Amino acid sequence: MNESYQPTLIEQLAQEYWEENETFEVKEDLSREKFYCLSMLPYPSGDLHMGHVRNYTIGDVIARYQIHKGRNVLQPMGWDAFGLPAENAAIQRELPPAEWTRKNIKKMRKQLKQLGFAYDWSREITTCDSTYYRWEQWLFLQLYKKGLAYKKNAIVNWDPVDQTVLANEQIVDGRGWRSGAVVERREISQWFLKITDYSEELLKDLDELKEWPEQVITMQRNWIGQSQGVIINFNLEKGPDKLQVYTTRPDTLMGVTYLAIAPEHPLAKERAKKSKKIAAFLKKCKQTRVAEADIATQEKEGIDSGLFAVHPLSKEKLPIWIANFVLMEYASGVVMAVPAHDERDHEFALKYDLPLKPVIEPADGHDWDYNQAAYTNPGKLINSGSFNDIDSKTAFNVIADYLKNNGAGSRQTHYRLRDWGISRQRYWGTPIPIIYCKTCGTVPVPENQLPVLLPEDIIPTGHGSPLKETASFYKTRCPVCNKPATRETDTMDTFVESSWYYARYSCPDQDKVMLDDRAKYWTPVDQYIGGIEHAVMHLLYARFMHKILRDLGLLNSNEPFIRLLTQGMVLKDGAKMSKSKGNVVTPQSLIKKYGADTVRLFIIFAAPPEQDLEWSDSGVEGAYRFLKKLWGFSYRIKDALLAVNQQKERSNYQWEAPEHRQTRQQIHECLQQANIDMERLQFNTVVSAVMKILNILIKLTTDNDAEAHLIREGTGILLRLLSPITPHISHHLWQSLGFGGDILDTPWPRPDPKALQTTELELIVQINGKLRGRIQVPTEASKEIIESTALNQENVQRHLADKKIKKVIVVPKKLINIVV
């Protein structure tokens, strides 16, 4: 053992030991309790950033802690390798995305290994490998057979110059990020997964997720968006057709003064054929982004269609307007407008001089100026004929029943959640296994022809779809009639890959089936770690896919992740680290200067996992100083500890002196609190406990046999508490100080109940309920001794002067109250 702390050397030695001994490669073992710890897999950008390091350090602390607790721990790592960023990088560098991606993976794998994470690298997966996406294509075929994968028209952001679909973040001021062309809303045929079939179960099973952050549960609940409402039929004034409207406020039905339909509604398209003004308006609407948030905040605009609908109750004529704020994807693309009781409808009505008809007044009867603002709260019905004077809640049921009895509507449970559009008009993604034949129509690729391989030698240009221009890919033969046919050139949303990867880690070597029984052993994931930004999309899709895999008989649980931790961001100067802000700190430079253990220790100590972490150079220096202090202490006590560790009776040592028992009590109290905090994932306070223990031990001397044994016990506790956080130095010191074997094979320390037993208690002394002092008494002191000690306390005597004691109340082991 060197006198000076040399992190580069000891970290290299520890990592070589783990690799040579396959320390973290695990097998299924039904005789042991399993623990599956997983951090969200990274996109291989080429460089680890501090956000990665924090995420994976937290996960590694949890995994190593569970190893110490004797569990069979799986902690794998892989790469979310498909997607737009790789394609964009390839366009800029004029090289195939496959080449760019695999080079980045190689670099990032090396960086992860430098940090000493306890990953089972034998299970590594890369989502752009055909051995992985083959099973994704197989899964798509199963969904297609069950009617859960289907194709329909949907609205997208279309770049007319690059001839491609754009994500919302690729649009800058209404123009394509590359071409600068004005982006259009275009309707194209796309593939969807029927997640809405699972809406009710996805909502209900949120109640099972007792160890998820409440914020995430709320976000998912709102995204699924269950509401109870009514479908109302509005017949068109002319002809047999009708418009169906979904509303959660049937109590406002008598206040409808117009209907609004989406620009993509068939009725709007039909009217555009007969009106140049309407056609021009629809064209203008196409230049709006498809994101719901953008549509909600844009200026409300519309045009009169010239058509009328008939109110189902009053039989009044209602004008039908085409409005840019109505979403075709929500309900039926028709809104019943009640401007007196809806802010958006109110704004639109004032702009286009449409009538307002108040039908609800405040329940307390105070006046409301409906021209100034919509009254949106429940209240009492007015101007509603036979429904007058009833409250909104009652009116919901009364009007819903009336509509049903008169064939004009029906109750409906509605979900905000829409089916998952998985088509991407991109190259770098999983090919959708579908063939189009002029004779046979849409034909799924036979399972024995999987995988449909993505050509990896393409250099995308950013113009159009590369797969449509690659004849060797899209030209094929129909598997049914053997005539010439074409392949689907859309690829799958990368959220599909990340919706089931956690299960594939259980059996990445399986080439006969998607998942085998090992998946049932390892899933669900016991602890999942990732950012709050994935609260809805990724986590919801993974929950959906887990239920699909369960229904296919491949898994036997309802939910993918038992416990979820959403770690905070890493900030510098109050802002998230980013290249554009110039506030990035690279992990590699810190590892080179201080070592991986210092980086890990700072990350863990600087903030609780769920809170944002403010970067501090002095904090990193402080972590490094602590590890040097630990090393120096260990070097000083090494010879004494080696000697003590060779004694046969070292584990049964009895401390007689009160000062030694008190010191031991302090150490075990720190351990007790650290264990509580480990279970609560409050690792920063575990580090605080370790620092306290080291400060206690440093004051002891190895010249005294009792203290040498105390140092041995305390150091053994300290190193095991640190082992998940700073594994390299803990591994090295454990062996160098003669504790024997691999520290990871040793059980997690538990406080000794005898050490925690105290010989004295501190009691609060009150006079008439007010704190007047504290006393120390033996733990087994009688009521009489407690009373006597309290009454003789100097401050108590001062407050008792000239007062008569009525009674003395002793609350055992807590307080004594003197009533005067």
UniProtKB/Swiss-Prot annotation:
Localization per Swiss-Prot or TrEMBL? Cytoplasm
Give one GO molecular function term: aminoacyl-tRNA deacylase activity
The record's comment on protein family reads: Belongs to the class-I aminoacyl-tRNA synthetase family.
Species source reads Coxiella burnetii (strain Dugway 5J108-111)
What is the residue range of the motif 'HIGH' region? 42-52
Biological processes annotated in GO? leucyl-tRNA aminoacylation
Chain's gene name: leuS
Which enzyme class? ligase
Q: What is this protein called?
A: Leucine--tRNA ligase
Q: Which HAMAP family match?
A: Leu_tRNA_synth_B
